[in-house]
Regions:
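Short amphipathic alpha-helical interaction segments
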Residues: 39-54
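Short amphipathic alpha-helical interface segments
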Residues: 11-27
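Short acidic, hydrophobic short linear motifs in intrinsically disordered regions
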Residues: 26-37
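Charged, low-complexity intrinsically disordered regulatory/assembly segments
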Residues: 113-192
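A short, conserved structural fragment
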Residues: 53-63
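Short Lys/Arg-enriched alpha/beta "domain-start" segment
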Residues: 76-126
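Short, cationic-aromatic polyanion-contact patches
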Residues: 3-14, 30, 63-81
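Beta-strand residues in well-ordered beta-sheet regions across diverse protein folds
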Residues: 59-61, 68, 151
Length: 192
């Protein structure tokens, strides 16, 4: 850690970045996802992330940005009690679907007007998030014990019907990927 970097040295943008990165355990967020979610200009976000990286508070990997380590000497007062996205769809995944492979096929992918935001994994639950191009709505797919829950979190006054429609778009996207996986796992019998 950079000893010259103190918690009180944080500006508002740095606090917002840390708040988002700390919103879920072991979370990784893409640059574009952070930009859309926080509404920052890309140059401003780049400078903010660079300063936090230089202070060894966050780290960048091919999977995105995340808080560095656990039990940091900093006690950033940015932990949120952010409520989980409003659950809209609960469904079970087919037993043939390997969650790791499903995640690999969905990670970084866009659908409709939603862009990849990031993911977190706490051992028992995988959470993947997408954000609308305008940054007004976030969708989240949580997978645990063969069950998938899709929820929406609006950062503005999106109507409930808009949230439901967006959740079903994500569900359709995930369903198509899962169906492809099931077809590959159990190809149709060929008649002679």
């Amino acid at each position: 850690m950079n000893p010259a970097f103190e918690e009180f040295d944080l500006d508002e943008r740095e606090r917002e970045v840390l708040k988002l990165l700390s919103s879920e355990q072991n979370a990784h967020f893409s640059f574009q996802g952070l930009r859309r979610r926080l509404g920052l200009h890309q140059e401003t976000l780049t400078r903010t992330l660079k300063r936090l990286e230089e202070a060894h508070v966050i780290e960048r990997s091919p999977e995105g940005y995340k808080l560095k380590g656990t039990g940091s000497i900093y006690s950033f007062a940015v932990q949120t009690n952010q409520s989980l996205a409003k659950p809209i769809i609960d469904a079970y995944l087919p037993s043939q679907v390997d969650v790791t492979v499903l995640f690999q096929k969905l990670r970084g992918r866009w659908f409709s007007n939603f862009r990849w935001l990031g993911y977190s994994h706490d051992g028992s639950q995988l959470s993947m998030s997408w954000i609308s191009e305008d940054g007004r709505m976030q969708l989240q797919a949580r997978i645990s014990s063969g069950k998938i829950t899709i929820g929406a979190d609006s950062h503005t006054n999106q109507t409930e019907s808009e949230q439901i429609a967006a959740a079903y778009q994500l569900f359709d996207h995930i369903t198509k990927v899962a169906e492809e996986m099931v077809q590959v796992a159990s190809p149709a019998l060929v008649a002679n």
